[in-house]
Structures are given as structure tokens and as C-alpha cells.
Amino acid sequence: MTLTAYLLILTAYLLGSICSAIIFCRLAGLPDPRQNGSHNPGATNVLRNGGKLAAIGVLLFDTLKGSLPVLIAFRCDLSPSAIGLIGLAACLGHIFPIFFQFRGGKGVATAFGVFFSISIIASTTMICAWLIVFLLTRFSSLSAVIMALTAPFYIWCFKPEFTFPVALICCLLIYRHHDNIQRLWRGQEERLWDKLKSK
């Protein structure tokens, strides 16, 4: 790989390490998402804690963390493997942020930003699948897991050269949702819609 690729991998990790959920909650006077709700510093938990505008900000910021480094990598005409590693680095930064004691979120929005920059068509299909599962079940976690399971197939259909790095990112997402998967299996997972209606 080139020096540009290595620099972008480092930049993507550091950008991913900026935990927007903590920052937006502090600015909005909301409780630390790591200490409330699901204890996950992500947009869904910020929404659970009552910060609708903050949640939108977190969602957009986290998506851009994945999207921007990959777009820059495309502009630099890097190889698919290098671009994939840059996207993976952004997700690793979000999940294991160096600026926040390596306690980060689950990486769904950041991963989606990566997928969006790789293929708009594939990522649009993914978000449609996410919405269908969410509307049917009201489980945000299940929607994310289904998206992670199907994303490599969608990428393979439209940008097959990125299938392997996308599959690596999806394995990371599923790993980060292992607690949610266990709660879903036991019937103990909380529906996002029910939580919002109770506020």
C-alpha cells in the first residue's frame, strides 16, 4: 500500500474515535449515554434518552465519519483493499475510540457511511431492508443485525471487489451486537418504539 493509504487509515481511525454521542449530549445538557439507557454511545440511545435533535446530529456525524475517509480514498484512486481497510479503520475508531478509553458505539451508522460511499445503490437497498425489519418488529438492534448479514450480498451484487472488506466490517457489527442477539433470543430486548412512547 502507498503512504497515502496508511495516512488515510490512521486519519479514518482518529476521525472514527470522535464520539459524537458524548459530545452532542454534553452540548444538549443530556446525560452521558454510556451511563443511561442501553449504555451505548450511539444515535439510538441518545434518542432513547430524549434527545431527538441530538440523535439526528449524532446519526449524521457518525455516518460522515465512515463516508468522508472512503470518499477521499476514492479520490486518491486507491485500491479496493486499501479503501476497505480505511472503512474498517473508521468503524474500529467508532467502536474502540482512543479518545474515550476505547468505549465506543456499535458502529452501525459509521459502517453505513462506508457502504454509502462504496455503492449508493447497495446502501439504499440496505436502508430499505433496515426500515422493513424495523417497521415489522420495532427492534432497532434486529434491523442492524439483518442489515449486517445482508450487506455483503448487496455489495457483491453492485461492487463485488469490495465484498471481503465489507464482510469484515459486518462481522464486527454482529460481534458488537452479541448482547442484543442474546436478549432477542430470550425475548428480553426492548423495542425502541415502546421506549419512545413511554417518554
UniProtKB/Swiss-Prot annotation:
Q: Which InterPro entries match?
A: G3P_acylTferase_PlsY
Instruction: Write down any Gene Ontology CC term.
Output: plasma membrane
> Is Transmembrane there in the keyword field?
yes
Q: Which reaction(s) does the protein catalyse, per the Swiss-Prot or TrEMBL entry?
A: an acyl phosphate + sn-glycerol 3-phosphate = a 1-acyl-sn-glycero-3-phosphate + phosphate
Please report the record's description of how this protein sits within the membrane: Multi-pass membrane protein
Question: PANTHER family from the xrefs?
Answer: GLYCEROL-3-PHOSPHATE ACYLTRANSFERASE-RELATED, INNER MEMBRANE PROTEIN YGIH
Q: Please report which protein family the annotation says this sequence is part of.
A: Belongs to the PlsY family.
> What's the protein here called?
Glycerol-3-phosphate acyltransferase
